[in-house]
Amino acid sequence: MELEVPDEAESAEAGAVTAEAAWSAESGAAAGMTQKKAGLAEAPLVTGQPGPGHGKKLGHRGVDASGETTYKKTTSSTLKGAIQLGIGYTVGNLSSKPERDVLMQDFYVVESIFFPSEGSNLTPAHHFQDFRFKTYAPVAFRYFRELFGIRPDDYLYSLCNEPLIELSNPGASGSVFYVTSDDEFIIKTVMHKEAEFLQKLLPGYYMNLNQNPRTLLPKFYGLYCVQSGGKNIRVVVMNNVLPRVVKMHLKFDLKGSTYKRRASKKEKEKSLPTYKDLDFMQDMPEGLLLDSDTFGALVKTLQRDCLVLESFKIMDYSLLLGVHNIDQQERERQAEGAQSKADEKRPVAQKALYSTAMESIQGGAARGEAIETDDTMGGIPAVNGRGERLLLHIGIIDILQSYRFIKKLEHTWKALVHDGDTVSVHRPSFYAERFFKFMSSTVFRKSSSLKSSPSKKGRGALLAVKPLGPTAAFSASQIPSEREDVQYDLRGARSYPTLEDEGRPDLLPCTPPSFEEATTASIATTLSSTSLSIPERSPSDTSEQPRYRRRTQSSGQDGRPQEEPHAEDLQKITVQVEPVCGVGVVPKEEGAGVEVPPCGASAAASVEIDAASQASEPASQASDEEDAPSTDIYFPTDERSWVYSPLHYSARPASDGESDT
């Protein structure tokens, strides 16, 4: 394994994946560069004469003299060719190796292969400059692709068989984006710190996908590096959130922040601008209305994903939302006429599993409920405030931003000038809470008037909204929203009470612990469950008939063990209990058995309560109240512990000779 050449300073922040229509040769790249913000730094490139757009840079992305996009002074055509050559070799070589389980060391493996321009016995000849291609964690990423149903030949066909298409509206991150011709995958250039963070994230990402592959988080299919001319260009292959075959009428990048979260004037001049939080609140005050089942599944998925991101200390992520307006498209088709209908091609659905928005949030897979996604193209059915039918394509993006020192400084500086709770850069816990609250209460809302259609067998698992017809529409007053009565808590044990667990384990606990805390708790639980002789709870133990904690003192003058309440810091009451059956005291030491009188013995039980007022009431009055069950294990000072439950022992009638004391 060879050492990598250090990169030049990489200071540009990662931005949103803002994909729209297909890119068309150099003209698309030149047009995209003219729409950038006016304040971009200008620096001349090494080669070529200045031309239109020459010298404009955003991060490492620029334009050369011919108008072609460059990244780290490497032309886009050269980068695309190197990526396709490298992936074709590495994936093909890996497919010849036998499959095996993923090991811990597999997450840190880096394979490297040299591609000379004249070719070698392992690599083909090419007309690019010599380069070295590195593949990170090939075995681990092969497992991820298999988990999402992506076969090696399909992966190679999508990435290497057809030319990659550069997106003309890449956003403000300074990255270059490519999409495959079949709309399956997005290739994005990432910075050194982002690639390094993804490598550290892989073990936890592996655990996350194992527990729940249905997530709105990005699906990473590969991490690669092209090394040429002393430059390292790292790229990541991900799922495509916004398919090009579906026309997006609106596009939003939402974070739950309000500080400078409005699309700029230059952005709004684009053919498909990326709007932000304040734009959404202004243009869609009623939010996006979903039926009950869809809303519940979406909220549950968002809650789980936010807890995962918080546990990894990830922040500054966004929800990419693409809105396809069905009614608007039908009106556009009617205006254009039926002349183009005969030539229209029906779009092909994406092949990867869990890649669409509907598949990412579906919660009924365990019950076998599904719908056919041909009509929705994987979008989530919704209705806006005007009653227009929509299809939503959503995904969480830009998760490779950890809360590092520079982010802490950025938030501190912004908080001094503006309200600290409104800026987008924030600590991970607060960021997750604000993000989840904004999405579950402002962006998405539950509508009781939307009914679910009967389920069909297919790839999706949620129930779709019934078609309302091409001319059907509801007014905002006819579509009630249930936003005001329900508040959703990110860390609540059950934030959405109508959801069931579906037989799947939760991804993370309500309050995500650190790795050290989780390990310590696991060891402590194992030791306590294996070393303590604790009777199992019988089926007859219910909430109405629980077990209680009791403590015994040494025998009194009459030889009977005396039960007395012990002084504790907690508030307590003393309850007099007269059992009608015999109870045995089992001390911790083996062989030391003490017998309790069969009946009639007065016993004092110490029961902990929370209310301070009840602690001062008489014992006779407190004994009439319902006893509080004990849920923990108590170890008395005299090293005796026993559990009393009348249902655990056979009842024995009291003899006539026994009397109450």
From Swiss-Prot:
**Outcome of P646F?**
Abolishes interaction with AP-2 complex
Q: Name one GO molecular function term.
A: talin binding
User: Which regions are flagged for Basic and acidic residues bias?
Assistant: 560-571
Q: Where is it predominantly found?
A: membrane
Residues modified as N6-acetyllysine? K265, K268
Question: How would you describe the post-translational modification of this protein?
Answer: Phosphorylation on Ser-645 negatively regulates binding to TLN2 and is strongly stimulated in mitosis. Phosphorylation on Tyr-644 is necessary for targeting to focal adhesions. Phosphorylation on Ser-645 and Tyr-644 are mutually exclusive. Phosphorylated by SYK and CSK. Tyrosine phosphorylation is enhanced by PTK2 signaling. Phosphorylated at Tyr-634 upon EGF stimulation. Acetylation at Lys-265 and Lys-268 seems to decrease lipid kinase activity. Deacetylation of these sites by SIRT1 positively regulates the exocytosis of TSH-containing granules from pituitary cells.
Q: Which organism is it from?
A: Mus musculus
Span of domain PIPK: 75-443
Name positions with the PTM Asymmetric dimethylarginine. Answer: R459
What SUPFAM superfamilies does its record include? SAICAR synthase-like (SSF56104)
Q: What is this protein called?
A: Phosphatidylinositol 4-phosphate 5-kinase type-1 gamma
> Can you list the GO cellular component terms from the UniProt entry?
adherens junction; cytosol; endosome membrane; focal adhesion; glutamatergic synapse; phagocytic cup; postsynaptic density; ruffle membrane
EC number(s) reported in the record:
2.7.1.68
Check the record and name the CDD domains matching this protein. PIPKc_PIP5K1C (cd17308)
Q: In which tissues is it expressed?
A: High expression in brain. Also detected in lung, thymus, heart, testicle, kidney and embryo. Highly expressed in forebrain, in particular in cerebellum, hippocampus and cerebral cortex.
Q: Where is this region: Mediates interaction with TLN2?
A: 636-661
Q: Where in the cell is it found?
A: Cell membrane; Endomembrane system; Cytoplasm; Cell junction, Focal adhesion
